[in-house]
Amino acid sequence: MKARAIAENEEYYGAEVRRRHGDAAMDAANERMAGMSQEEWNDAKALEAAILDQLAAAKETGDPTGEAARKLCAMHARWLQMHWGEGTYSPAAHAALAEGYVADPRFTAYYDGSAGEGATAFLRDALVAWCAEQ
């Protein structure tokens, strides 16, 4: 399951990540995912599902700076740290990633398809605001 997810991630996003952030960043993310224990992998997948649920709930409030949105952002940061590894997370990188979500139709399709139309823009707005406070 992990090997397939890594291969799909590489296929869909690898060239762009390597172009924007270098081979080392993509290789490190792949190694981090490959090195996860089954429990860590399951935890990451469960958190991903919970993030989508929280995104839908937060979007319903209409407030990207409200309590539901802040909870969403903290969950998303934790998910990134699980995938990027310890010591690689920064609010600036997180905010830049959020901007990339709305610029890339693949992410818009994923988030809007999972949490409703406008979810990607809401997530970006929430993350940019939250990251500015960190």
Give the predicted meaning of each segment.
Residues 1-134:
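Amphipathic alpha-helical "stalk" segments
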